[in-house]
A protein has these predicted regions:
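Extracellular beta-strand/beta-solenoid scaffold signature
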Residues: 30-46, 62-78, 98-116, 122, ...
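Transmembrane beta-strands of outer-membrane beta-barrel proteins
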Residues: 341, 672-676, 707-711, 746-752, ...
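Extracellular beta-strand/loop-rich repeat segments of large surface/secreted proteins
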Residues: 424-425, 438, 442, 447-583
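Outer membrane beta-barrel translocator domains of Type V secretion systems
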Residues: 629-794, 901, 906
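Solvent-exposed, glycine/polar-rich loop segments of beta-barrel outer-membrane systems
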Residues: 689, 716, 720-722, 755-772, ...
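Outer membrane beta-barrel transmembrane domains
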Residues: 732-737, 819-923
Length: 923
């Protein structure tokens, strides 16, 4: 009976609303509100009941409140006996207040003890406060939790939700919040599932007196409270005007500030999701913060953070901060971008990450800080800024950049108040420590006091571009990582393991390294040389104070027009380069090489690096050695020229390849077509695959057949240093004599236009060129088909082919002028075919030949920026060829022929080639 009474007997009278129930005598209360798809317009609250309230809403039900300030409310000041409000099923909540009330809330809990609102079924929450013209203050919050006692354990669980809060057109102060928790209770907590939070505040104040503000925040935890969410995206927008003293926008706030005593520790834990924060307008202060943490904790998963500020006409202090932490806070964030952008105001400042006496731990993040210089302000930009004692920032990888831009988006190179990383007092900033992630830093690094920046760049795509002024930190460059030094630098400790330093500094801005260890490379930028290729290095010097025993440096230069072709000029250039390095420590500890790397047409040169104590510890060279005079670029160009004549040579086939067994053709005239496909290569230097097409016509006069043919060859070449294409289109005239007793002779004259284009990639750079030339060949073949028994036959044969490809002058994309001599070739061939004929229906055969190219050498001359070099090539060679083929008479007027061949023993090999053709004869 008691159980039935518990659920079925209502000990109250409903006055005006079933939700404002008098349940003074019931421990629990359950009410079914709707059957689904219905709207309800009364506030859900408890005024004088005991225990728990449970409300059953149907599917897709909506709670729509107009003219009141709360959707769901549990307020101990109205009834301290109710412990819990439970909403079964999903419930959308909409609260609109256009009256003069100061505030509106979707869900409101003010608890003294252990109070709870459970709407874990989820649903959207919309709050709108508008036109509060007479209010001194207007506020809206999607969810609001507060309590007065340290022992409180109040909880709001809202489930999955999209929260939209707008406080618009208020005359004076404006505040808009998504989730808000406050109070000193140790376990006050808001729990949210997945969803989104969108908050917007707008003021229309036109009065210049008083202190008015616009403040918005997506998630806000004060005092000792905690807010925990799933994956949530946040958009927060604050818009003021020139009479609003302060306009601020925050994505997530955890503020444990206390006027006296230690700071409390509010905590926000949230999953993945983007945060976009925008503040616009404002008279004195306009700022935006992705995170703002004061003596609290924020733990966030992956996602992007963007904080943007646009100052008003008369704004003074304008700043944007992706993450701001102070007063012993702890921030942890997953992968994603962190962007801060600010423009307008008199003082315009951006911080990607700003840390004051706190700890910030970041996974792989891309930090970008941009302040805009409009010509009337003082802009400053910082990627990471750490200050105060015990401040620590740990970044696992990604990118960090800071820059001041003009209004057109172009970087203002005249503004020096921007730093990718800045540390002060005893702060520590660690980047990629104990990990192997890509790191890209654009901007200067500077520390003051006892601060230290520890950088670990250990992948080939990691690069730091900027100056370093850090007397306490460390820099590690390994596995091809680069530091492009652009200004005066002081490095406390440098370790290299095949790392690289590119010196691109003004001549007065030395790079000083206190302690060095390892093996690495220093490359100086030198844009200019004189007409004889003597280098002019106008960068600063690199100065080593001390080095660990066994340390080594390679000193080099980036310039393709340094003279290493002349021994005297080579020594002069090596000494100029060595003289840019100074070392004051123990000479046994640091050794090195000075290397002028191979250019496009200049060979490598190197020497040992020594330091002269009598010359202020300046570097000089000894034991000079030179490299191969033919550079990699030149060697590739030589092979490109070879492919042209080898491809031309491949086209000149034997009579049987071109026409098959002409004796089997009836009629006085004939047309024929053939296709050939194959490959040739030279060691591991290049490989060419080609397609050849030929169409011909001939007629008979006595024992002679006279004809003409057009052909096209299209080849693609892969080189060790690049790729290319070769093409040719030709016209051939031929005469073929078929004598008695199997004798035959074949004469072919061919003229064609050849083209080559290529791309070469070497350490010296990319070279592209294209050129055309004429080719001519004359071929004569003689042989005799000797019939044996049972249809067998043998055909000994000899052939001589003379070829010439004309010379050509051309200029590559990078300025190399090439003058190429003509190339000649004379290929002699002796060989035989042995086969068997089948009742005049055709034959099959095997063949073998010995070939020799009696070619002479050809010279090529190259020049670049006043320097000249050349190379010679000789394609003479001897090789064997073997193959199989057949002739098949399809009918009285047509026959089909084909063969496959392979070469052996030559420098240039043909691993495979097939040829197929067909001839049609007619009277």
């Amino acid at each position: 009976m008691r159980k039935d009474l518990k659920y079925k007997i209502l000990l109250c009278l409903l006055a005006g609303s079933v939700l404002a129930a008098n349940t003074a005598f019931a421990a629990e209360y359950t009410e079914t509100i709707s059957s689904g798809n219905e709207n309800y317009s009364a506030e859900i609250k408890s005024t004088d009941g005991n225990g728990n309230y449970t409300y059953n809403f149907g599917t897709d039900a909506k709670l729509i409140i107009n003219g009141e300030s709360r959707g769901i409310s549990l307020d101990y000041t109205e009834n301290s006996n109710t412990n819990k409000i439970i909403i079964n099923e999903k419930l959308d909540i909409s609260v609109t207040n256009k009256d003069n009330a100061k505030a509106a809330y979707g869900i409101y809990l003010q608890g003294d003890g252990d109070k709870e609102i459970d709407r874990s079924g989820g649903g959207n929450i919309n709050v709108l406060v508008e036109d509060s013209e007479l209010s001194a203050f207007a506020m809206g919050s999607g969810v609001y939790l507060t309590s007065p006692s340290p022992s409180d354990n109040n909880v709001i669980n809202i489930g999955n939700a999209d929260i939209n809060v707008q406080v618009l057109n208020a005359k004076y102060g404006v505040e808009a919040y998504g989730l808000t928790s406050s109070g000193i209770g140790d376990n006050n907590k808001i729990i949210m599932g997945n969803g989104s939070i969108n908050v917007k505040g707008l003021s229309v104040n036109e009065d210049s007196s008083g202190f008015y503000n616009v403040a918005v925040s997506g998630i806000t935890a004060y005092d000792n409270t905690e807010i925990e969410t799933g994956d949530v995206s946040i958009v927060a927008t604050a818009t003021g005007n020139e009479n609003i003293v302060e306009t601020v926008a925050h994505g997530i706030t955890a503020n444990g500030w206390m006027s006296s005593g230690p700071y409390l520790n509010p905590k926000v834990i949230t999953g993945n999701g983007d945060i976009t924060v925008t503040a616009q307008g404002g008279l004195d202060i306009t700022n935006a913060n992705g995170f703002k943490v004061v003596g609290g904790t924020i733990e966030k998963g992956a996602g992007n953070i963007k904080a943007e500020v646009i100052g008003g006409t008369n704004s003074y202090d304008v700043w944007a901060q992706g993450i701001y932490a102070e007063a012993g806070s702890l921030v942890t964030k997953g992968d994603g971008n962190i962007t801060a952008i600010a423009q307008g105001g008199e003082l315009t400042t951006t911080y990607g990450v700003r840390n004051s006496e706190s700890t910030v731990n970041l996974d792989i993040v891309n930090i970008s800080s941009v302040a805009v210089n409009d010509g009337n302000n003082t802009p400053s930009a910082y990627g990471i800024y750490a200050e105060g004692n015990n401040a620590e920032v740990n970044v696992q990888g990604g990118s960090i950049s800071a820059q001041v831009n003009n209004v057109d988006g172009v970087t203002d190179n005249n503004n020096n108040d921007s730093y990718a990383i800045f540390g002060d007092r005893s702060s520590v900033i660690n980047v990629n420590q104990r990990t192997t992630n890509k790191v890209v830093i654009n901007g200067d690094i500077k520390t003051g006091g006892k601060a230290a920046v520890n950088l670990n760049l250990n992948t080939s795509d990691s690069v730091l571009t900027g100056s370093i002024e850090d007397k306490k930190g460390t820099l590690n460059l390994a596995n091809g990582a680069r530091w492009v030094a652009t200004g005066y630098s002081e490095v406390n400790e440098l370790t290299m393991n095949q790392g690289n330093i590119y010196v691109d500094t003004p001549f007065w801005a030395d790079v000083s390294i206190t302690k060095y260890s390892g093996t690495g490379n220093i490359l100086f930028k030198a844009d200019d040389t004189d007409k004889e290729g003597v280098v002019n290095i106008d960068t600063s010097s690199v100065i080593f104070t001390d080095a660990e025993k066994g340390s080594f440096i390679n000193v080099g230069i980036a310039n393709n027009s340094i003279n290493t072709l002349d021994i005297d000029k080579t020594e002069e250039n090596l000494n100029v380069l060595a003289g840019k390095v100074y070392y004051a420590g123990d000479n046994d500890n640091l050794n090195g090489k000075v290397v002028i790397k191979e250019g496009l047409i200049t060979p490598e040169a190197s020497a040992d690096l020594v330091f002269d104590t009598a010359n202020n510890n300046r570097g000089s060279v000894t034991n000079i050695t030179g490299g191969n005079r033919v550079t990699q670029t030149m060697d590739a160009m030589k092979h490109i020229a070879e492919t042209a004549i080898v491809a031309w040579r491949q086209e000149d086939s034997t009579l049987s390849q071109r026409l098959g067994d002409l004796r089997e053709s009836d009629g006085g005239q004939g047309i024929w077509v053939r296709m050939s496909r194959g490959e040739f290569n030279y060691d591991s230097q290049y490989e060419n695959q080609y397609n050849f097409f030929q169409l011909g016509y001939d007629w008979a006069r006595g024992n002679w057949h006279y004809g003409a043919a057009v052909s096209h060859n299209d080849g693609e070449t892969t080189y060790a240093q690049g790729m290319g294409e070769n093409r040719s289109t030709s016209l051939s005239l031929y005469g073929t004599w078929l004598g008695r007793n199997g004798h035959y002779a074949d004469i072919v004259l061919k003229q064609g236009r050849l083209s080559n284009d290529f791309d070469i990639y070497t350490e010296a750079g990319h070279t592209h060129g294209d050129y055309d030339m004429w080719g001519t060949s004359l071929s004569g073949e003689y042989g005799r088909k000797i019939d044996l028994k049972d249809g067998w036959y043998v055909t000994p044969q000899a052939q001589m082919t003379l070829m010439r490809i004309g010379g050509e002058d051309f200029t590559t994309n990078n300025g190399i002028h090439v003058r190429q001599d003509s190339l000649e070739s004379a290929v002699g061939r002796v060989g035989f075919e042995v086969g068997k004929a089948f009742d005049k229906k055709g034959s099959i055969y095997a063949k073998a030949s010995l070939l020799h190219d009696f070619a002479g050498s050809a010279d090529t001359y190259l020049s670049l920026k006043g320097l000249s070099n050349s190379y010679s090539q000789d394609i003479g060679d001897t090789w064997w060829e073997a193959g199989l083929g057949f002739n098949y008479k399809v009918n009285d007027s047509s026959y089909l022929y084909a063969d496959v061949v392979k070469t052996f023993g030559g420098d240039v090999e043909t691993p495979w080639q097939w040829n197929v053709g067909m001839r049609w004869a007619f009277v």
